[in-house]
């Protein structure tokens, strides 16, 4: 699972979790702007925008921030955002997938090249890494809200496929991408708290590398995560 590695100590994972929260906020704002550009600023007639506004509220993004970015998105000067995916091989045969949302693909591509120049690894052709991963829907359930055994009893009933407990803060209820909305609704109906839902990449096989390669991969992953346009970084390192 993304971000889980035996070479990452507790402090490193805590720092990455805090950083991740800021990334989630930023991603939602970019999705909001994109939705306005595609379907207009009125949530009554723009279903995608309506969904993203609710998502922003669920993430406790202040209303004034939502309103400000709705106005910003309506401006002709505001560029639209595009989703881009990059594939890399790190050290010891570890595959890495980077998902970004950007208003300037040339800038993001340049940032990716800088990352591998500074931290190693190699950018590869589309499909070279993706075949090692499966696309899944994931509902993020706070561990503070429910115990694993109780949640597990709901997973199958709600249409989920699996429960991942490796994250320190959240359980991940995994499902087919097309089932994500219905699984979330079913979980909510059973009183389960879902802090976030999104599509993720799950490794089909894990690569066990030595300590030196593991630490080099973490340094590369951390650099990638700190690129402004990058939202998520996935890898298949144990």
UniProtKB/Swiss-Prot annotation:
<dbReference type="GO" id="GO:0003677">
    <property type="term" value="F:DNA binding"/>
</dbReference>
<dbReference type="InterPro" id="IPR002876">
    <property type="entry name" value="Transcrip_reg_TACO1-like"/>
</dbReference>
<dbReference type="GO" id="GO:0005829">
    <property type="term" value="C:cytosol"/>
</dbReference>
<dbReference type="Pfam" id="PF20772">
    <property type="entry name" value="TACO1_YebC_N"/>
</dbReference>
<dbReference type="GO" id="GO:0006355">
    <property type="term" value="P:regulation of DNA-templated transcription"/>
</dbReference>
<feature type="region of interest" description="Disordered">
    <location>
        <begin position="1"/>
        <end position="21"/>
    </location>
</feature>
<keyword id="KW-0805">Transcription regulation</keyword>
<dbReference type="InterPro" id="IPR049083">
    <property type="entry name" value="TACO1_YebC_N"/>
</dbReference>
<dbReference type="InterPro" id="IPR048300">
    <property type="entry name" value="TACO1_YebC-like_2nd/3rd_dom"/>
</dbReference>
<dbReference type="Pfam" id="PF01709">
    <property type="entry name" value="Transcrip_reg"/>
</dbReference>
<keyword id="KW-0804">Transcription</keyword>
<feature type="compositionally biased region" description="Basic residues">
    <location>
        <begin position="9"/>
        <end position="21"/>
    </location>
</feature>
<dbReference type="InterPro" id="IPR026564">
    <property type="entry name" value="Transcrip_reg_TACO1-like_dom3"/>
</dbReference>
<dbReference type="InterPro" id="IPR029072">
    <property type="entry name" value="YebC-like"/>
</dbReference>
<comment type="similarity">
    <text>Belongs to the TACO1 family.</text>
</comment>
<keyword id="KW-0963">Cytoplasm</keyword>
<keyword id="KW-0238">DNA-binding</keyword>
<protein>
    <recommendedName>
        <fullName>Probable transcriptional regulatory protein TC_0742</fullName>
    </recommendedName>
</protein>
<dbReference type="InterPro" id="IPR017856">
    <property type="entry name" value="Integrase-like_N"/>
</dbReference>
């Amino acid at each position: 699972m993304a971000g889980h590695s035996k070479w990452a100590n507790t402090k490193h994972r805590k720092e990455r979790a805090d950083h991740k929260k800021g990334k989630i906020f930023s991603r939602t704002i970019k999705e909001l702007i994109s939705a306005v550009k595609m379907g207009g600023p009125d949530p009554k007639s723009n279903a995608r925008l309506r969904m993203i506004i609710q998502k922003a509220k669920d993430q406790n993004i202040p209303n004034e921030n939502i309103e400000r970015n709705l106005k910003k998105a309506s401006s002709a000067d505001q560029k639209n955002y595009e989703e881009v995916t990059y594939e890399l091989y790190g050290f010891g045969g570890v595959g890495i997938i980077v998902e970004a949302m950007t208003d300037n693909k040339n800038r993001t591509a340049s940032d990716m090249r800088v990352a591998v120049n500074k931290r190693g690894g190699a950018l590869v052709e589309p499909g070279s890494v993706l075949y090692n991963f499966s696309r899944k829907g994931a509902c993020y359930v706070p561990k503070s809200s429910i115990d694993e055994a109780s949640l597990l009893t709901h997973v199958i009933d709600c249409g989920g496929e699996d429960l991942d407990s490796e994250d320190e803060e959240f359980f991940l209820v995994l499902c087919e991408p097309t089932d994500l909305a219905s699984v979330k609704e079913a979980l909510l109906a059973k009183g389960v708290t879902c802090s976030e839902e999104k599509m993720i990449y799950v490794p089909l096989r894990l690569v066990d590398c030595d300590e030196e390669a593991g630490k080099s991969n973490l340094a590369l992953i951390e650099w990638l995560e700190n690129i402004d346009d990058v939202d998520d970084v996935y890898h298949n390192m144990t």
